[in-house]
Amino acid sequence: MEIKEMVTSEMPRERLLSHGAKSLSNTELLAILINTGRKGFLSIDISNELLKSASNLNELKKSSINDLIQVKGIGLQKAITLKAAFELGERMGRRAENNRIKITQPSDVADYMIPTMKDLTQEHFVILLLNSKNVVIKESCVFKGTLNSSIVHPREIFSIAVRENANAIIAVHNHPSGDVTPSQEDIITTMRLKESGLILGIDLLDHIIIGDNRFTSLVEAGYFDEND
């Protein structure tokens, strides 16, 4: 029995096409790499056995060709395919790590975000998620349109930060007019996020407003001072 005998909607390839790769389990992703099963086993069964052979994915990627072919259903060609996929993933991970930006001052944020935000014709509200070393681990656009403090919910923003295990966040949004003067709504939104961050233990480090090759840091402008 091979994977083609499964109900079409349940096949890993079909699920990937319908719902995206992120919706698939580790077992299903490996089954796609394994491609075909062997007599009496679906590729999904072989994938399960493969995962059982190592304590976790990190250990599995360290497996040698000889280790992999010890798993029933994994021949030399499948082992080579898996090893190549593991190495490619490792290289991509190293490259992503090397490309991450460390934030040490507001101008670092501006240099990072101005190229993508300065020409936008609509306001975009983005959060940068940082680890404990102030390295950007992810950016997420949470809102598009005219900024309104009643629309930008701290709950939505910090749920993303919690999900990504962020240590701190920086808010960034653009002014299509090019004027980087903070509006009253900008200030209110900043204060709400700052207060929520203090409660949750995820600091809002700054709010940067991007204009036409210019920026304003609300920290540098004094809005984060304890007396404000």
From Swiss-Prot:
It holds the Pfam family UPF0758_N. Keywords: Hydrolase, Metal-binding, Metalloprotease, Protease, Zinc. PROSITE patterns: MPN, UPF0758. Residues 102-224 form the MPN domain. Zn(2+) binds at residues 173, 175, 186. GO terms for molecular function: metal ion binding; metallopeptidase activity. InterPro entries: MPN, RadC_JAB, RuvA_2-like, UPF0758, UPF0758_CS, UPF0758_N. A motif (JAMM motif) lies at residues 173-186. It comes from the Bacteria. One of its GO terms (biological process) is proteolysis. Belongs to the UPF0758 family. This is UPF0758 protein SAB1521c. It comes from Staphylococcus aureus (strain bovine RF122 / ET3-1). The lineage of its organism: Bacteria, Bacillati, Bacillota, Bacilli, Bacillales.
